[in-house]
Amino acid sequence: MKRLIIMSLLIGCFYTQAKHRKICLQDALNLKLVKAKAYSLGAYQGSCMTIKIKNLTKDSLIILIEAGRKLNSLDDNYQDILIVKEELLGLRLSEEKSIKIKGYCCQASNRGPFSGLEYGLNKLADTNLVKLANYLNVNSFNQTTEQTAVWAISDNRVTASITEINDSIALPLRQMVASIKREPIPWYKLLTKNFQYSTGQISNYPISLRGKLEYSNEKLNYATLIIVNNKGIWTGQIKSFWLDASINNELDLNVSLKGFAKGKYSIQLITNKKQLASKDFEI
């Protein structure tokens, strides 16, 4: 019975057959079957890392590099990287090989790595990042979208900023991240832009907000669309216009947010007598 239990624990991650072993990198490291090092290729997203693994055994090994592994910069000034695509690496006895790895920065406040920066790799990320990595392992989006999704969890950035030009493509990922974070699916889309300075620091700037604002208007009114901060202070008047009487209508929004600071706001449709609609959003 004891032997059966031990064998069951190893199924799926480790097996031996005709002196060929397939084993997860984590188990191979724990059992000292391999030694491994990770290095940056000089970027913080996409195929930006390389892992070098040496087989220390007399058998051939097939190493599974798991999605969800967190590569930790040995210099705390630089970003950690989350692996989002699993890879298999075959090694003959005593052989050493390198393999490129797809991953994303999961520490937005730190600097982007330079080429050759060494990373530690004997650690899986937290549960939420592992869930996201496993999702990205089998679902593909553009690099900016995937990077934004990682930051939405690792750095608690706004889930609404997970977008693509064809937003129907990004919607499932936005829904997935909202589920992981246990928050409502955002009613709006926040378009942003990243800028990396020569120091390696990365800043993120808001571009615009898109969505639909539901309202009801009992009679013809002159209405104004405004943005209010979390202290109730007007921070932007978008436009004023005549609004026909209508019930349960929708106003299409495409609002510039250039120059707005990060924080919580509401977008409101008002007349000189009352508020017709209000929606909260965050940058």
Go through the PLM ranges and name each one.
Residues K19-G42, P184-G200:
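Low-complexity, acidic Ser/Thr/Pro/Gly-rich terminal tails and inter-domain linkers that flank the onset
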Residues N72-G120, I233-D252:
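Intrinsically disordered, low-complexity Pro/Gly/Ser/Thr-rich segments with frequent PxxP/GP/PP motifs
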Residues M1-H20:
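Bacterial Sec-dependent N-terminal signal peptides
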Residues S47-D59, I63-I65, Y215:
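Asparagine-centered strand-capping/turn motif at beta-strand->loop junctions
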Residues L225, A261-K274:
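Short, aromatic- and glycine-rich surface loops/edge beta-strands on solvent-exposed regions
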Residues D59-Y78, T224-K231:
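Short acidic, flexible loop segments centered on an aromatic residue
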Residues Q275-I283:
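Edge beta-strands of extracellular beta-sandwich domains
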Residues G46-C48, L190-K219, D252:
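Contiguous beta-strand segments within globular domains
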